[in-house]
C-alpha cells in the first residue's frame, strides 16, 4: 500500500514539473531569472505600444514581449504583390476626426499623415444596400419603400429609427446631441429595468414591430450589437453615442500599423534600457514571496502570417517588478495565472463577448462593380459578404482593389470554414492570409447577386488576401458588451484583476462601448492604467 502511494507521489511530482513552470511559492522563489526588469509589457499592439511609449523616459528597465514577429496587433497594414503602392488595411482601417482625441494626439506626436478615408461609412450616392434580395440606395433605406412591413409610426421615423426606439423605450430626447455614457447607463425602460440589462431583442420587442426590429438589425449590418446576449445599450451607443460624434473619416498615409510601430520605435529610441523581444508567447505568470513576478515565455516561429509555438524548446524565464498584460481578452482568459480564476476577475471578464471578424481583399483588372446600373462604391447587405468597399486603383499595375467581404459574427466564422477548404486560388497570398476557391466562389456568388450581374460575366481575381480575426491570440476583431453588466462596476477589475498584485491589463477589449472596436479604446485603457498606477 505504502509503495503504491510512493509511486503515485513520484508520478505527481514529475507531472507538475514537466511543463517547466513552478507550481508553488517555494519553487517560484528558487526560480533562476534569465533576465529581470522593472516592467514587463506583454503585447505589441496599440495598447502595449502606447504603454511603453508613455513610460519611455521613466528611467525604468522596461521590456516589451510580443507573441508574433509583427508589431501592430489588430492594426495590420498589408500589400499585395501587384499593388505595392497601395496600403491594404486588413485590420482597423479608419478613425473619426473630432471623436478620437487620443489617436489624433498620438498621430501628431509621431508626425504621421492623416488622409481622408474616401468612402467614410458609406456616402449618399455612392452606397447601396442589398436586403432581402432587393438593391436599395441609401436614400431609399432612409425614406423610401423597403422590403419590410413597417408600422405607420416606424415608417414616419424610418430615417431615425434607432433614435425613435430609444425615445419610446426611455423617454429620452437627444435633440441632436450625443448619448453620453453616464446618461446611457442610467436609462430605464417602462417596467423599471435598466436598459443595459436588456438584450437587443428584449428591448426592441417592447417598442418595435417584428418587421421594424428586423429592419433595424439588418441595416445595422454588423451583428455584434444585435444578436445573442449583446446589451441593448450597444446599438444605441453605436448609432448615437458621443464617441461616434465627429466630422470627417480619416486613415493614415503611412498605414494604420504605423501608429503602434511608431510608438514602439520611439520607446526603443528613448533609452538603451528599453527593449523589445518578438516571438515570445507568455505561457504562465507567477509571484514570488518578495513580490517579484516570474513570467514563463515559450519561443514561437512566424512564417507566412502564421505564428506557432515551439513546444520542444525550453521556456524563457523573465522576472519583473510589475507587469502590463496588453493582451486580447481571448488570450488573457487562457493565461496560466491563478488570479484570473478568482470570482471577481471571472465575473468581470464574462461581461464581454469576443466577436469574430474577417476581411477578404481581391484585385481585378477592371472595376466590374462600377459598370452596371447598381454601381456603388460601398454595399452593405444581409448576405454572406456583409459589406463591400471599393478600395482604390493601383497606379503601379492598373488593377482595381476591392474589399470583397467585411464580416463579423457567424458570417465570419462560416467564411473561415470555407477558407480552410479546397485549393488556393491563383494569385492568393500564401499561408494564413490565403484565399481558397470555396471562399472566393461563395463571396463572389453573393456579391454578383447583389449587383445584379451574372457570376460568369465578371473577371477572376488577379490577387487576393484574407484576414480572419478568429484565432489565437486575438480570437476576435472586437468585443461586445453582454446584457446585465454595468461598465463602471467591472472595468476597474478588468484593468487590475487582483488588488494585491501589480499586474495590469490594457487593450481595446477593456474599454467602453463604441471605442472598444477602435484603436482609441486601446489608447484610452493604456493611458488610464499608466496614469493611475505608474506616473
UniProtKB/Swiss-Prot annotation:
Enzyme Commission (EC) number: 1.4.3.2
Keywords for this protein: Antibiotic, Antimicrobial, FAD, Flavoprotein, Fungicide, Oxidoreductase, Secreted, Signal
GO cellular component, one term: extracellular region
One Pfam family this sequence matches: Amino_oxidase
Reactions mediated catalytically: an L-alpha-amino acid + O2 + H2O = a 2-oxocarboxylate + H2O2 + NH4(+)
EC class: oxidoreductase
Superkingdom to which the source organism belongs: Eukaryota
Known cofactor(s): FAD
SUPFAM superfamilies given in the database record: FAD-linked reductases, C-terminal domain, FAD/NAD(P)-binding domain
Tissue: Expressed exclusively in the ink gland. Within the ink gland, it is only detected in amber vesicles (at protein level).
Main location: secreted
Reported modifications of this chain: Not glycosylated.
UniProt key word Zinc: no
Gene Ontology BP terms: amino acid catabolic process; defense response; defense response to bacterium; defense response to fungus; killing of cells of another organism
Residues annotated as binding substrate: 94, 406, 513-514
GO molecular function: L-amino-acid oxidase activity
Residues reported in the UniProt entry to bind FAD: 46-47, 66-67, 74, 91-94, 513-518
Cited function: Catalyzes the oxidative deamination of positively charged L-amino acids L-Lys and L-Arg and, much less efficiently, of amino acids L-His and L-Tyr. Has antimicrobial activity. Inhibits growth of Gram-negative bacteria E.coli strain MC4100 (MIC=0.62 ug/ml), E.coli strain C921-b2, S.typhimurium strain AA 140 (MIC=0.62 ug/ml), P.aeruginosa strain PAO1 (MIC=0.31 ug/ml) and V.harveyi strain BB170 (MIC=0.25 ug/ml).
Full protein name: L-amino-acid oxidase
Organism: Aplysia californica (California sea hare)
Amino acid at each position: 500500500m505504502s509503495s503504491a502511494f510512493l509511486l503515485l507521489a513520484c508520478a505527481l511530482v514529475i507531472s507538475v514539473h514537466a511543463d517547466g513552470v513552478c507550481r508553488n511559492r517555494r519553487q517560484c522563489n528558487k526560480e533562476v531569472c534569465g533576465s529581470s526588469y522593472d516592467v514587463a509589457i506583454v503585447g505589441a499592439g496599440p495598447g502595449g505600444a502606447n504603454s511603453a511609449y508613455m513610460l519611455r523616459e521613466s528611467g525604468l528597465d522596461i521590456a516589451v514581449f510580443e507573441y508574433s514577429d509583427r508589431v501592430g496587433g489588430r492594426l495590420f497594414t498589408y500589400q499585395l504583390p501587384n499593388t505595392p503602392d497601395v496600403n491594404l488595411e486588413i485590420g482597423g482601417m479608419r478613425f473619426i476626426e473630432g471623436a478620437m482625441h487620443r489617436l489624433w494626439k498620438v498621430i501628431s506626436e509621431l508626425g504621421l499623415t492623416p488622409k481622408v478615408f474616401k468612402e467614410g461609412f458609406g456616402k449618399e450616392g455612392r452606397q447601396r444596400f442589398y436586403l432581402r434580395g432587393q438593391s436599395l440606395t441609401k436614400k431609399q433605406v432612409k425614406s423610401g419603400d423597403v422590403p419590410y412591413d413597417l408600422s405607420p409610426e416606424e415608417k414616419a421615423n424610418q430615417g431615425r429609427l434607432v433614435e425613435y426606439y430609444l425615445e419610446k423605450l426611455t423617454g429620452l430626447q437627444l435633440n441632436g446631441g450625443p448619448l453620453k455614457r453616464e446618461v446611457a447607463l442610467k436609462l430605464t425602460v417602462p417596467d423599471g429595468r435598466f436598459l443595459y440589462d436588456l438584450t437587443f431583442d428584449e428591448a426592441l420587442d417592447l417598442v418595435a414591430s417584428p418587421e421594424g426590429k428586423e429592419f433595424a438589425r439588418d441595416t445595422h449590418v454588423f451583428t455584434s450589437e444585435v444578436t445573442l446576449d449583446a446589451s441593448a445599450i450597444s446599438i444605441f451607443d453605436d448609432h448615437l453615442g458621443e464617441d461616434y460624434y465627429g466630422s470627417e473619416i480619416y486613415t493614415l498615409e503611412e498605414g494604420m500599423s504605423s501608429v503602434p510601430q511608431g510608438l514602439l520605435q520611439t520607446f526603443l529610441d528613448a533609452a538603451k534600457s528599453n527593449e523589445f523581444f518578438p516571438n515570445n508567447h507568455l505561457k504562465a505568470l507567477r509571484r514570488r514571496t518578495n513580490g517579484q513576478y516570474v513570467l514563463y515565455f515559450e519561443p514561437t516561429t512566424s512564417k507566412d502570417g502564421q505564428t506557432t509555438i515551439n513546444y520542444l524548446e525550453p521556456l524563457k524565464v523573465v522576472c519583473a517588478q510589475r507587469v502590463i498584460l496588453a493582451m486580447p481578452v481571448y488570450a488573457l482568459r487562457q493565461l496560466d495565472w491563478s488570479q484570473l480564476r478568482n470570482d471577481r476577475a471571472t465575473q468581470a471578464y464574462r461581461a464581454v463577448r469576443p466577436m469574430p471578424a474577417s476581411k477578404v481583399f481581391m484585385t481585378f483588372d477592371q472595376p466590374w462593380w462600377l459598370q452596371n446600373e447598381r454601381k456603388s462604391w460601398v454595399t452593405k447587405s444581409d448576405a454572406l459578404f456583409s459589406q463591400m468597399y471599393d478600395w482604390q486603383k493601383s497606379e503601379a499595375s492598373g488593377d482595381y482593389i476591392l474589399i470583397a467581404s467585411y464580416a463579423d459574427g457567424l458570417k465570419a466564422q462560416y467564411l473561415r470554414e470555407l477558407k480552410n477548404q479546397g485549393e488556393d486560388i491563383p494569385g492568393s497570398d500564401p499561408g494564413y492570409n490565403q484565399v481558397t476557391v470555396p471562399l472566393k466562389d461563395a463571396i463572389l456568388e453573393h456579391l454578383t447577386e447583389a449587383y445584379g450581374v451574372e457570376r460568369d460575366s465578371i473577371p477572376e481575381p488577379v490577387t487576393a488576401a484574407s484576414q480572419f480575426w478568429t484565432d489565437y491570440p486575438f480570437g476576435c476583431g472586437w468585443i461586445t458588451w453582454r446584457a446585465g453588466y454595468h461598465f463602471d462596476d467591472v472595468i476597474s477589475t478588468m484593468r487590475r484583476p487582483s488588488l494585491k498584485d501589480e499586474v495590469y491589463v490594457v487593450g481595446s477589449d477593456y474599454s467602453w462601448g463604441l471605442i472598444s472596436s477602435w484603436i482609441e479604446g486601446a489608447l484610452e485603457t493604456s493611458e488610464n492604467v499608466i496614469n493611475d498606477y505608474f506616473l
